């Protein structure tokens, strides 16, 4: 008499890992541009990480705000300069808004791009921020290629602009150029590297500890464990169906649960074996350490991003750290971003903005 072969099947809930640093395992090769990361999607990965780690994102936001400041002090007796400060381009952006976006891109991706628009008579000057994630360095290293979706690049949809100080005539008759700001990093020629690059790992740790807390809330702090199910399964497909039914029966996503389907006997011995783990303290300490390391990687200061010390907040400490940040980070970044703008004002519209 033929006997059906019974088979035990093991399945684990919540076992899929989310990518953190790469969006694709493939390596991109092109004779049109220099790739930014192996898959040419490094800006997307950096942006994704900034949306996942709260401390990491807060520091980037604060850096951009501190660098842009509340506005500019300038000679209001120069009407052309006043006009550019108040409205730097046809989109209605003020110069402060443009600089703030440049500072944000540079803090986040280590690169920033400023488009410059004028005409042959130099009768006007417009400055546009270009999203760094849309920009790639052309193979000749003299142009920047802009595309809306680098995961599906099409040459006919791209816009190419020359790197400053070269200008090229466009279809609308304007002369355009683009300035590439980048953070220096040895061994990297075409793109800059963000200063916090050594803190990518701890940013991921902070993100994962947040995920752990969220999963604990989603499961109402239910224990993880092993669910032993007595059921007869003729094949793997049948066993998988039984497991899926069990998952739906137990709230669909019951924490970290391992389901084991075994051949049933005369009596039903299905049971749940909890696995108790008292590691809240370890996770809390890990999160605190990751937060401290993120601040260090950014070359930033805790009190300037709303992070307290064990001794609590101190007005004197905040003022001291701001003074250090002003002289080591903020003023240097302001000068780096504004130096080309001052040069453009002098060369194109004859405005001296050195003061």
For the regions a protein language model found, what residue spans apply to each?
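Structured, contiguous alpha/beta core segments that scaffold functional sites
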Residues: 2-264
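Short, hydrophobic beta-strand segments
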Residues: 225-230, 270-277, 317-324
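Long amphipathic alpha-helical segments
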Residues: 142-169, 238-316, 335-354
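Hydrophobic alpha-helical scaffolding
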Residues: 232, 236, 280, 284, ...
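Long, continuous compositionally biased terminal/linker segments
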Residues: 322-340
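Generic structural signal for hydrophobic core residues of well-folded globular domains
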Residues: 84, 88, 102, 230, ...
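A short small-residue
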Residues: 201-203, 312-319
């Amino acid at each position: 008499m033929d006997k059906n072969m019974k088979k035990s099947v093991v399945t684990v809930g919540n076992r899929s890992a989310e990518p953190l640093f790469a969006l694709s395992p493939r390596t991109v090769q092109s004779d049109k541009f220099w790739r930014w990361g192996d898959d040419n999607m490094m800006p997307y990965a950096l942006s994704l990480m900034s949306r996942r780690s709260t401390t990491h994102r807060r520091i980037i936001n604060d850096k951009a705000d501190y660098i842009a400041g509340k506005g500019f002090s300038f000679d209001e007796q120069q009407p052309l300069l006043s006009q550019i400060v108040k409205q730097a381009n046809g989109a209605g952006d003020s110069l402060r808004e443009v600089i703030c976006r440049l500072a944000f891109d540079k803090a986040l991706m280590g690169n920033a791009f400023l488009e410059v628009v004028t005409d042959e008579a130099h009768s006007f000057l417009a400055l546009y921020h270009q999203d760094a994630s849309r920009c790639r360095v052309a193979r000749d290293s003299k142009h920047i290629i802009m595309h809306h979706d680098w995961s599906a690049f099409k040459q006919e949809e791209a816009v190419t602009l020359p790197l400053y100080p070269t200008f090229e005539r466009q279809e609308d008759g304007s002369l355009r150029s683009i300035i590439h700001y980048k953070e220096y990093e040895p061994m990297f020629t075409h793109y800059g590297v963000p200063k916090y690059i050594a803190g990518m790992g701890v940013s991921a740790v902070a993100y994962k500890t947040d995920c752990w807390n969220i999963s604990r809330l989603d499961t109402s702090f239910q224990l993880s464990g092993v669910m032993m199910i007595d059921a007869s399964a003729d094949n793997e497909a049948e066993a998988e169906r039984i497991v899926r039914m069990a998952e739906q029966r137990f709230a669909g996503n019951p924490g970290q649960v391992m389901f084991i389907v075994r051949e049933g006997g005369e009596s039903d011995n299905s049971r749940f074996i909890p696995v108790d783990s008292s590691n809240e303290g370890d996770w809390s300490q890990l999160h605190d350490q990751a937060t401290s390391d993120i601040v260090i990687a950014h070359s930033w200061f805790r009190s300037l991003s709303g992070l307290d010390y064990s001794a609590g907040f101190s007005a004197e400490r905040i003022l001291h750290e701001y003074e250090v940040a002003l002289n080591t980070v903020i003023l240097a970044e302001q000068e780096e971003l504004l130096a080309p703008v001052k040069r453009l004002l002098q060369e194109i519209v004859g405005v001296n903005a050195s003061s």
